[in-house]
């Protein structure tokens, strides 16, 4: 930071303030995590200077012999970690990984059957405001209204009726195990391809705490942050025979030069994820989520699907007569960061919402365990029961700040 402070004090101030926010607040946004010092060091290296259009051994620029080493390390580690024949580590984000995968499997105006955004899907699974909804014909499936679980019978019926060329499984706000074998069976019945977006659960899949989609999906995409705890970026996994077409759809299809400093950081994160300590970490992520779920259920809060099998919970606040927007604001005042989130069969705008999504990856990285999550749950309950009581929220904030400062940002 020394050079930033000297050369750009305005930016330095923003970074310092953000550092303080991350230290002093409890991060419960399910898609966020805390990268290790090694990951961040790799991302800030001199590799950022190097253009490397193409792939290892087949570049359009000279001088790529050392960045080739970095990219090959990331590729081989990804393949080993997920037991995949092929890996592309160049996508700049999960959205670009999905875009490249779509173009590798189908054509514009083809039909995609994907999960409804308000039921837990993702923008890139067919939202009309996203490229996926603009370039492709979209049919959406959802969850059962009574159980909150993916309605596989509905998926099968919609597939039979609309004959999509591609079925997308995976979610951004679904707290239960996904049965990829059922999705593949449905896809095979109608001759469709199956894409699995495992961005949220990649860390759990890597440690065998969630069934792997690799044996079932024609292509699997993921981000490299979230539960995988790496730099922000994307990745594609598939069979060797799909490699050539996927590579061409990423470069030159939708990207130019890869970000070699980020790819180096991906290599570091994938190496970290192969260690025994990462398995212990992921187990704790789930234990913490289940503890949080139990405490909130006991306090009278409604959880979509009644609980969680993974790293996140989706809280429907309708019975509390609180909007997600107001809950997010109150919790932020109390020192707890969450995001407002639509819930299945949502009646409010996505800028207001009826729910909040919370997750445990970041707090688990800081070293919190089940006992600590009971405290966190109590603060959440108290804050949401007093959303208009600024004095109470400020008091919680003081307690949260003192508590949070007992934990380093990265403890693994």
UniProtKB/Swiss-Prot annotation:
It is found in: Cytoplasm. Belongs to the SHMT family. Catalyzes the reversible interconversion of serine and glycine with tetrahydrofolate (THF) serving as the one-carbon carrier. This reaction serves as the major source of one-carbon groups required for the biosynthesis of purines, thymidylate, methionine, and other important biomolecules. Also exhibits THF-independent aldolase activity toward beta-hydroxyamino acids, producing glycine and aldehydes, via a retro-aldol mechanism. One of its GO terms (cellular component) is cytosol. This is Serine hydroxymethyltransferase. Homodimer. Its EC number is 2.1.2.1. Keywords: Amino-acid biosynthesis, Cytoplasm, One-carbon metabolism, Pyridoxal phosphate, Transferase. Its main location: cytoplasm. It is an enzyme of class 2 (transferase). It catalyses: (6R)-5,10-methylene-5,6,7,8-tetrahydrofolate + glycine + H2O = (6S)-5,6,7,8-tetrahydrofolate + L-serine. Its cofactor is pyridoxal 5'-phosphate. GO terms for biological process: glycine biosynthetic process from serine; tetrahydrofolate interconversion. The modification N6-(pyridoxal phosphate)lysine is found at residue 226. It comes from Lawsonia intracellularis (strain PHE/MN1-00). NCBIfam families: PRK00011.1. Pathway: One-carbon metabolism; tetrahydrofolate interconversion; Amino-acid biosynthesis; glycine biosynthesis; glycine from L-serine: step 1/1. (6S)-5,6,7,8-tetrahydrofolate binds at residues 117, 121-123, 349-351.
């Amino acid at each position: 930071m020394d050079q930033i402070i000297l050369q750009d004090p305005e930016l330095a101030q923003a970074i310092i303030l953000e550092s303080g926010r991350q230290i002093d607040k409890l991060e419960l946004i399910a898609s966020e995590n805390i990268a290790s010092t090694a990951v961040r060091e790799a991302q800030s290296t001199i590799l950022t200077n190097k253009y490397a259009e193409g792939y290892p051994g087949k570049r359009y620029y000279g001088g790529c012999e050392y960045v080739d080493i970095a990219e090959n390390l990331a590729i081989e580690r990804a393949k080993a970690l997920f037991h995949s024949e092929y890996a592309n580590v160049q996508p700049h984000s999960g959205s670009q990984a999905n875009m490249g995968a779509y173009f590798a499997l189908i054509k514009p105006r083809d039909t995609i059957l994907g999960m409804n955004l308000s039921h837990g899907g993702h923008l890139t699974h067919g939202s009309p405001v996203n490229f996926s909804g603009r370039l492709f014909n979209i049919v959406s499936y959802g969850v059962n209204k009574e159980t909150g679980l993916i309605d596989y019978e509905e998926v099968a019926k919609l597939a039979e009726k609309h004959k999509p060329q591609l079925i997308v499984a995976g979610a951004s706000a679904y707290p239960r195990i996904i049965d990829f074998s059922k999705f593949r069976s449905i896809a095979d019945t109608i001759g469709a391809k199956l894409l699995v977006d495992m961005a949220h659960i990649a860390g759990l899949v890597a440690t065998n705490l969630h069934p792997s989609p690799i044996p079932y999906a024609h292509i699997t995409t993921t981000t490299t942050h979230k539960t995988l705890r790496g730099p922000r970026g994307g990745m594609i996994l598939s069979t060797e025979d799909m490699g050539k077409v996927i590579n061409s759809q990423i470069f030159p299809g939708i990207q130019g030069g890869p970000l070699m400093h980020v790819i180096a950081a991906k290599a570091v994160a994938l190496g970290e994820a192969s260690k025994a300590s990462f398995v212990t970490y992921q187990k704790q992520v789930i234990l913490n989520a289940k503890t949080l779920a139990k405490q909130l259920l006991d306090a009278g809060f409604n959880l979509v699907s009644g609980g969680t099998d993974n790293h996140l919970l989706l809280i429907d606040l309708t019975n509390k007569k609180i909007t997600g927007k107001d809950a997010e604001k109150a919790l932020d005042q109390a020192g707890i960061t969450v995001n407002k989130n639509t819930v299945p069969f949502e009646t409010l705008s996505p800028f207001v919402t009826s729910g909040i999504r919370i997750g445990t990856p970041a707090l688990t990285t800081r070293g919190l365990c089940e006992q600590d999550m009971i405290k966190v749950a109590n603060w959440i309950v108290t804050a949401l029961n007093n959303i208009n009581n600024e004095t109470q929220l400020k008091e919680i904030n003081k307690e949260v700040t003192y508590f949070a400062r007992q934990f380093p940002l990265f403890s693994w």
